[in-house]
Amino acid sequence: MGNNPSALKRARQNLKRNLRNVSVKSELKTIEKRCMSLIREGKKEEALEFFKFVSKKLDTAARKRIIHRNKAARKKSNLSILLLR
């Protein structure tokens, strides 16, 4: 780690951003698992409503560059394929 003020500030910012990104990624994993479980249980209407919520969260994370936009698209595609079966 650097010793000048700007390097110290960057280190603080990186730590704060890392904590926020880890939190968002964890939330994404949790809601994806919940959507998968709704699909597996056969609750199509609930799963469809929840898919819209998951889709919105994935797009937001991609827009903020927490995850790559292609990853968000892939996750949404896989969930929608499972939902339509």
UniProtKB/Swiss-Prot annotation:
Which Gene3D superfamilies would you find in this protein's record?
A: Ribosomal protein S20
Pfam families linked to this entry? Ribosomal_S20p
Give the GO terms filed under biological process for this record.
Answer: translation
Entry keyword set: Ribonucleoprotein, Ribosomal protein, RNA-binding, rRNA-binding
Keyword Ribonucleoprotein assigned? yes
Q: Which GO terms describe its cellular component?
A: cytosol; small ribosomal subunit
Q: Which Gene Ontology MF annotations are present?
A: small ribosomal subunit rRNA binding; structural constituent of ribosome
Regarding protein family, the annotation reads:
Belongs to the bacterial ribosomal protein bS20 family.
Query: Its function?
Result: Binds directly to 16S ribosomal RNA.
Q: What protein does this entry describe?
A: Small ribosomal subunit protein bS20
**Which lineage ranks, top first, belong to the organism behind this chain?**
Bacteria, Pseudomonadati, Spirochaetota, Spirochaetia, Spirochaetales
What gene does this protein come from? rpsT
